[in-house]
Amino acid sequence: MYLKRKVYDQLLDWKNDTVHSTLEVNGARQVGKTYIINKFADENFRHKIYINLFDLSGKQFMECYKKATDWTPGTKRPEQPLHDAFKLFDPDFEDTNDTVIIIDEIQESSEIFNRIREFTRYFQAHFIVTGSYLGRVLEPEFKFSSGDITSIRIYTLSFKEFLEALDDQLFQKYLSLPLDHADDTVPELYDELKNVYDIYRQIGGYPKVVETYLNTKDVEAAQKELVRIIRIFLNESMRYFDDITDISVFTNIFLSICRILLREKKGLDEDSISEELQKLVTKNYSSNLSKATCYRAINWLYHSGIIGFCGKITELDILNFKPGSRCFFMDLGVAYYYLSRTGATVSTMDGSLNENYVYINLSKRQEFPEEIIFETPAFATYKGGEIDFVAQTLKTHIRYLIEVKAGKGTASTALKALEQGKANKLLYLKGDTKGGTVGNVQTCLLYTSDAADDLI
């Protein structure tokens, strides 16, 4: 089953760019990287070579690489050993602009990863490298070549992509809805969209999970597939840790993230989310887990695309920006799965899931080419209160205060900050409204705006 993905357009932009670079495609395990890259390659290049360093093709290529690069001192050096390696692997290989070489799971070999600069500079062929656990390339033996790489991140399906896959007619109606006011002629449309969003919140956007739901229309069956994906990730992660022997360590971190998100008292007791998580995990689960190991596990989850960090702007002073002050999940289905295991009430879960949804969409808009400023999405404190998110456009410099509400409530802290000139606009993203604009305060449905993507 083909699920239409927005990232396909980014792949085309890379191919057509006059700057010749190696494309690094990153993203969490099972987000569909291999499928979309191979589809793109098949449709846009005359010849494709696919190597997965995690399976037999990788083993075979490494044998070709070793044979092509072997050299005895005192003898003539090979003129093009890297070209020879690909020729040994695929006798039909030609170094032309219409050839693409895909090296999957690149993190499995520092030797090949460190050749990226040469792939970029000495080949006419295009190179795409990808991996699910690129956190490993931060280790010393991996030499990063930033000037030769264009990076693209593939996320799980967005709500828009899920809606289009589920019901194209409903998707077209969704696109026609006005964002700045209510359309009272189609009340049933708002109800339909809310129902789809509720399903999306429960299952998230992993392609196999979405496919399962599309085939069965069964939320529980889709969640079962999600659990399978989570377990694959946890078990595979164990390969990269010598001092973690039980996958429950990662589960404990996930549950601790949920409990921090569910707290009524805002802010952290510790200086960073990593320190707060380490304290919770060792207190509630394993006092034998070292601080260093816990930090590495959290970092691993971040670089594997499972969690993301959120900054904090103290007293709405953008010069007082503190990164890594909160943590969110990068897929709504994963967030739902773990939040539902904390014993939280439905209304409390709703609030956390909606905030997580907005976080994911703001994160996407900070990928190149960036549309909003700051290193990561950020929340803010002001006059003893808190504002869910602050976003400022890169081109127009308009600053938005964003408040996420499950119902029809208002946000006194954000209103106060707006009145005192701390921002240009206040944007309410609500679960129970049809939208509207009053002055510089705009309200819209969470799921009709795809988390402010068309507003800011």
Model-derived regions, located:
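N-terminal pre-Walker A segment at the start of P-loop NTPase domains
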Residues: 1-14
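Conserved lysine of the Walker
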Residues: 33
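Hydrophobic positions on the alpha1 helix immediately C-terminal to the Walker A/P-loop
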Residues: 36
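Sensor-1/coupling segment of RecA-like P-loop NTPase cores
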Residues: 122-141
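Interdomain motor-coupling "hinge/lid" segment immediately C-terminal to the ATP-binding subdomain
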Residues: 142-263
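Accessory nucleic acid-recognition modules appended to NTPase machines
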Residues: 221-386
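Conserved catalytic cores of phosphodiester-cleaving nucleases, focusing on short active-site segments
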Residues: 362, 387-408
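Conserved small/polar residues in nucleotide/adenosyl-binding loops
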Residues: 447-454
